[in-house]
Amino acid sequence: MASTQVNPTRMELTRLKKKLATATRGHKLLKDKRDELMRQFLDLVRENMALRQKVEAGIRSANVNFVIAKAGMSEQALNTALAAPKQAVYLEADKKNVMSVDIPVFHYKTRTADENDIYSYGFAFTSSDLDGAVKSLADILPDMLRLSETEKACQLMAAEIEKTRRRVNALEHVIIPEARKNIKYITMKLDENERRDRKSTRLNSSHVSIS
C-alpha cells in the first residue's frame, strides 16, 4: 500500500496538499485543453472532408477534359502544348500555434498575375477541352494546399489529443487519488499520535498528582 510508505508528518501533509491543489488545477486545465482540441479537431475534420470532395471533383473534371482533348489531338501536339509552361507557382511553408500544436500553413504566389498564363500554348492547334483541364487544375490549387494543411493539422491534433487524454487520465485515476489517499493516511496518523500524546499527558499528570 503506497500510503504506508509516506512519512506521516505535518510538513509532508502540507506538501501533499499543495501537490493535490496543483494536480487538481492542472487536471481542469488539461480537460479544458482536451475539449477545445476536440472541438477544433472536429471542425478541421469537417472542413477536410468538404475540401477533399471539392478537390476530387476538380481532378475528375480535369481528367475528363484531358481524356477528351487527348482523343481529339495528336500525341505530339498534346506533348508540345504542355512541354513549356508559362506560369510557375512558388510555395512557402509556415506554421501557426494552435493549443500548443504547430499547424502548417502554406502560402503561394504565381510568377505572373495574368490568369491566361496558365495556358502554355496557343489556341490555334488545341481544343477547348484541354483548356478546361488546365483551368480545372489551376482553380483547385488553393483548395489542394488547404487540404494538405488540414490533413496534417488533423494528424498533429489527433496526436496532441491522445497525449492530453493520457495526462488527464493519469491525473484523474492515479496522481489525484493517490495524493488524497496519502493525505487521508497522514491525517489519520497525526490524529492517532495526537490522541496518544494527550492520553500520555493525562496519565503523567495523574501520576504526578498521586505522588
Indicate residue ranges for each PLM-predicted region.
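Single conserved hydrophobic/aromatic residue that forms the stacking wall/gate
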Residues: 203-211
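Charge-rich amphipathic alpha-helical interaction elements
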Residues: 1-202
